[in-house]
Swiss-Prot record:
<feature type="compositionally biased region" description="Basic and acidic residues">
    <location>
        <begin position="262"/>
        <end position="271"/>
    </location>
</feature>
<feature type="coiled-coil region">
    <location>
        <begin position="362"/>
        <end position="417"/>
    </location>
</feature>
<feature type="compositionally biased region" description="Polar residues">
    <location>
        <begin position="275"/>
        <end position="295"/>
    </location>
</feature>
<dbReference type="Pfam" id="PF00169">
    <property type="entry name" value="PH"/>
</dbReference>
<keyword id="KW-0175">Coiled coil</keyword>
<feature type="region of interest" description="Disordered">
    <location>
        <begin position="1"/>
        <end position="37"/>
    </location>
</feature>
<dbReference type="InterPro" id="IPR011993">
    <property type="entry name" value="PH-like_dom_sf"/>
</dbReference>
<keyword id="KW-0597">Phosphoprotein</keyword>
<keyword id="KW-0343">GTPase activation</keyword>
<dbReference type="GO" id="GO:0045296">
    <property type="term" value="F:cadherin binding"/>
</dbReference>
<dbReference type="InterPro" id="IPR001849">
    <property type="entry name" value="PH_domain"/>
</dbReference>
<feature type="domain" description="Rab-GAP TBC">
    <location>
        <begin position="619"/>
        <end position="811"/>
    </location>
</feature>
<dbReference type="InterPro" id="IPR050302">
    <property type="entry name" value="Rab_GAP_TBC_domain"/>
</dbReference>
<dbReference type="GO" id="GO:0005654">
    <property type="term" value="C:nucleoplasm"/>
</dbReference>
<dbReference type="InterPro" id="IPR035969">
    <property type="entry name" value="Rab-GAP_TBC_sf"/>
</dbReference>
<dbReference type="GO" id="GO:0070161">
    <property type="term" value="C:anchoring junction"/>
</dbReference>
<feature type="region of interest" description="Disordered">
    <location>
        <begin position="228"/>
        <end position="297"/>
    </location>
</feature>
Length: 922
């Protein structure tokens, strides 16, 4: 039975198989060294007979099938004969890979592997197999390289990228041709001419019938029985190529010999046509063996030994005479030096005796003494030189000994090699003395084995080249599919962003219509209310049905993306804000977020620099944020960290209950009620937060615990996920970044920062400050909590964590920058409000309406410049001095009040009954 079909085509699809293939006329695959370029010929259909392995049980075996290719679908159809009207089945080549085995049992066997099955085919010859594999590869590549039917693209982009894409495709095709040389078309086995050939014989007719597709077999048989000769000719029609004139045969099928445009047929190599196992006959090789000189080696060596001994004796005699001559020369030199010394002594004595006066004789003696002194110095210098030379001679002697040992080793090796040579020579002499017939037999068997090995090597080489080309082409196809997928994902993200924008505008329009309609009579307000309810209740399943990802309920850190407000108008506003946030995120993902992620990925080692400062202001990607925060915290608390410090604080908390433990327990349930990590009963975050806050209470007894610290620690836990790291992050914020007394009982530093913010707001945003002052709006009621928890309750999580990225590196100046930027972002909306109650109501949630994090960052770090730290310190010092004076004045008033109360006493006024007196007392 046949394998399970991938897809059974209809009869209408199979009547006209459109597969066309290029037929390159080049050398055969055996000539791998010189691959000729393919010639441009008339396109021909890819079709022909192949054997397909299939079936089950006793009828399992090879079945002859007619295969033809369909270019429109990239499918390879097959039927029992070329005259069948309906194909039996098809093979999807778009996702298939091809393989050929060099060690296959039968020559010409190859495989087509699809995701659902493996089809084993067999061609008539090895050349036909390679031709089919190359053509199938080419057809698959042409199918994947065909321009996809994508949605409309801007004409300018197509005009700009057109030449580049065409050049890229040409380069890829040129690369594919470098692996396996194009194979010549097998004559009579492939193409339309193969349909005219008789069907290859099979062992039995029953074995060739496909029981899996019995219905198709019956249809084809009935079609052939009902047909006449004219119908049979019509059945042959689609398989024969159309000729230029009616009755003339196609010249491209059988090229004429006189046509100069086609290559002449190369004569067959007689060496290749002969059997590879054929070898020269025995008698022709005997004279070569008899002409060898190996049997005369022993006589030549015997005659050469006497001459070598004579030469050695003569060389020894010459060496002795040379040594004797050298000694005679040394003796002559010594006698010559002694003669010169005697003559010099004689001349000195004659000069001494010839002197007439004692003065001259004394001068001669002095001269000789000086000469003796000089000679002594020279003797000492020569002695030193001699010692140095003796030392060098010792070193040279050691080197000579080492070289002698090396020479001895080489001589031993040489002696061993000579022994091996002698043994081999003796063995060779014995082998030459053996009969020639046995030698010829061994030689012929070895040569035959060598021919078989050459055949195997050539087969494996061909297989290797084909597999290399297959891997290369599959990789190219995968890369092209990945590029298409990336382009489609980018376009999908853009369409999602546009959809979010349109939906947010739609909801904003509904909200404006609702506000404008008011309480008018009629069905118009009810219709608006129904539309708003439908927009708010639009489920994610409906978004999936149209292929768009909906707005997720929670973000990456567990915060609600759509805040849960009780009022209907605020619910609609929250939905609009969530859509705008997603729209900004999708639009900025490719243009801004991807380059930023790439820059962070290359930043392996963190060091303080201007580049790191800019990257932190732009925001840290989620996958890098824990690592970056740990590094920022460690820079600030490394002088406070000690091994085991956190565990000691936890042990102290278990041993003794802290006074702030009750307040911490109450605030745990109030920490981020919209975050799933702190509201889920099975979450471990509340327990971690409790331990972090208790450890900090023991770490800093001056502060202990203050409301607001729970939110700081919770943000650190959500990002770092490790409670000890979150503890040190809380320590870094409270003890190293924020000013002292920020969380004291009087919150002195916090109040100072509120006054500083008021001064900066009047300087940077004078119109807004005047407008708020006109309506007597106290901004500290809104902004005090911003500074106390660093915007933890105010901004959406994406913008909040970007603020914290820069805050942990630069300090509190970032908080002032973003506070001013928030008012600048919403300045026009606040100026339009003309009632203090409306302003307070808007300021209560206006920070949640900020969606564009890039715009807010640009305002904070560009529009708010200049923002020197020196000015911030001066303002803090001035306001702190005023605040401390006010606190001292309040303290004095409190003391005066207590003293006045103490002086007046606690006696009740006359006529008043004391609580201690009963009703029945007189």
């Amino acid at each position: 039975m046949e394998d399970a079909p991938e897809r059974t085509p209809s009869s209408s699809e199979s009547t006209q198989p459109p597969g066309l293939a290029r037929e390159p006329e080049v050398v055969s695959p055996g000539d791998s060294e010189g691959c000729a370029r393919p010639l441009d010929t008339v396109p021909k259909k890819l079709c022909g007979y192949l054997s397909k392995f299939g079936g089950k049980g006793p009828i399992k075996g090879w079945k002859c099938r007619w295969f033809f290719y369909d270019e429109r679908k990239c499918h390879l159809y097959y039927s029992r004969t070329a005259q069948d009207a309906n194909p039996l089945d098809s093979i999807d080549l778009s996702s298939a890979v091809f393989d050929c085995k060099a060690d296959a049992e039968e020559e010409g066997t190859f495989e087509i592997k699809t995701p659902s099955r493996v089809i084993t085919l067999k061609a008539a010859t090895k050349q036909a197999m390679l031709y089919w594999l190359q053509q199938l590869q080419m057809k698959r590549w042409e199918f994947h390289n065909s321009p996809p039917a994508l949605p409309a693209t801007p004409a300018a982009a197509l005009a700009e990228n057109g030449p580049t894409l065409h050049l890229k495709l040409e380069q890829e095709e040129a690369e594919l041709e470098e692996f396996l040389c194009p194979v010549k078309t097998p004559t009579g086995l492939v193409g339309a001419a193969a349909a005219l050939q008789p069907v290859p014989a099979v062992p039995s007719a029953l074995q060739n019938i496909s029981l899996k597709h019995l219905g198709t077999e019956i249809q084809n048989t009935m079609h052939n029985i009902r047909g006449n000769k004219q119908a049979q000719a019509a059945a042959h029609g689609p398989l024969v190529e159309d000729s230029p004139q009616g009755g003339e045969p196609q010249s491209g099928e059988q090229p004429s010999i006189s046509d100069p445009s086609l290559p002449e047929k190369e004569p067959e190599d007689p060496a290749k046509s002969a059997p590879r196992s054929s070898v020269p006959s025995g008698p022709t090789q005997k004279p070569k063996r008899q002409s060898n000189t190996f049997p005369f080696f022993s006589d030549g060596l015997a005659r050469s030994r006497t001459a070598q001994e004579k030469v050695a004796a003569l060389e020894q005699q010459v060496l002795m005479l040379t040594k004797e001559l050298k000694s005679q020369k040394e003796l002559v030199i010594i006698l010559h030096k002694a003669l010169e010394a005697a003559q010099q002594e004689k001349r000195a004595s004659s000069a001494y005796l010839a002197a007439t006066e004692d003065r001259d004789r004394l001068e001669l003696v002095r001269h000789k003494v000086r000469q003796i002194a000089e000679l002594n110095q020279r003797v000492e210098a020569l002695e030193q030189g001699r010692e140095r030379l003796a030392h060098e001679a010792g070193l040279r002697e050691q080197q000579v000994q080492a070289l002698q040992q090396h020479v001895q080793l080489l001589m031993d090796k040489n002696h061993a090699k000579q022994q091996v040579i002698c043994k081999l020579t003796q063995k060779l002499t014995e082998d030459l003395a053996q009969p020639a017939d046995a030698t010829n037999g061994d030689f012929l068997s070895q040569q035959e084995r060598m021919e078989h090995l050459k055949d195997d090597m050539e087969a494996y080489r061909t297989q290797n080249r084909f597999l290399n080309s297959e891997i290369h082409q599959v990789t190219k196809i995968w890369r092209k599919v990945a590029e298409k997928e990336k382009a489609l994902l980018t376009k999908c993200a853009y369409l999602q962003a546009r959809n979010c924008q349109v939906e947010s505008k739609y909801l904003a329009g509904l909200r404006r219509l609702q506000e404008a309609a008011g309480a008018e009579a009629g069905d118009f307000p009810e219709l608006l209310q129904q539309l708003i309810q439908e927009a708010l209740q639009w489920e994610a399943g409906e978004a999936d049905s149209v292929g768009l990802s909906p707005v997720s309920e929670y973000d990456d850190y567990g915060f609600l993306t759509v805040p849960d407000y009780e009022m209907e108008d605020l619910k609609l506003l929250a939905k609009i804000q969530a859509l705008e946030v997603r729209s900004h995120h999708l639009l900025a993902h490719e243009a801004v977020e991807r380059p930023l992620r790439d820059r962070w990925a290359t930043l392996t080692e963190l060091t303080p620099s201007a580049e790191l400062k800019q990257l932190l202001r732009a925001g840290v990607p989620r996958e890098h944020r824990p690592r970056v925060w740990r590094w920022l915290v460690h820079r600030r608390v490394r002088h406070l960290q000690a091994p085991g410090c956190y565990q000691e604080l936890l042990a102290r908390g278990r041993a003794c209950e802290h006074p702030a433990a009750r307040q911490i327990e109450l605030d745990l349930n109030r920490t981020f009620p919209t975050n799933k990590h702190f509201t889920c009963p099975t979450s471990s975050f509340p327990d971690k937060l409790r331990r972090v806050l208790l450890a900090f209470s023991w770490q800093n007894p001056t502060i202990g615990y203050c409301q607001g610290l729970n939110r700081l620690a919770a943000i650190a836990l959500l990002v770092l996920e490790d409670e000890e790291s979150a503890f040190w992050c809380l320590v870094a914020i409270v003890e190293t970044i924020l000013p002292a007394e920020y969380y004291s009982k009087t919150l002195t530093a916090s109040q100072v920062d509120q006054r500083v913010l008021q001064d900066l707001l009047s300087e940077k945003l004078p119109r807004l400050t005047a407008h708020l002052g006109q309506h007597r709006v106290d901004l500290s009621l809104i902004t005090f909590n911003w500074f106390l928890v660093v915007f933890a309750d105010s901004l959406i999580s994406d913008i909040l964590l970007r603020v914290w990225d820069a805050f942990l590196y630069e300090g509190t100046k970032v908080v002032f920058r973003y506070a001013l930027a928030i008012f600048k972002y919403n300045e026009e909306a606040i100026l339009q409000l003309q009632d203090s109650l409306e302003i307070y109501q808007y300021l209560r949630f206006f920070t949640k309406t900020i969606c564009d994090s890039r715009k807010l960052m640009s305002i904070a770090f560009n529009d708010m410049n200049p923002f020197p730290m020196k000015q911030l310190r001066q303002l803090r010092a001035a306001h702190r001095e005023r605040l401390e004076a006010e606190l001292r004045e309040l303290e004095l008033l409190k003391v005066e009040y207590l003293q006045r109360r103490a002086s007046l006493g606690r006696a009740p006024p006359e006529g008043c009954v004391s609580e201690d007196e009963g009703e029945g007392d007189s």
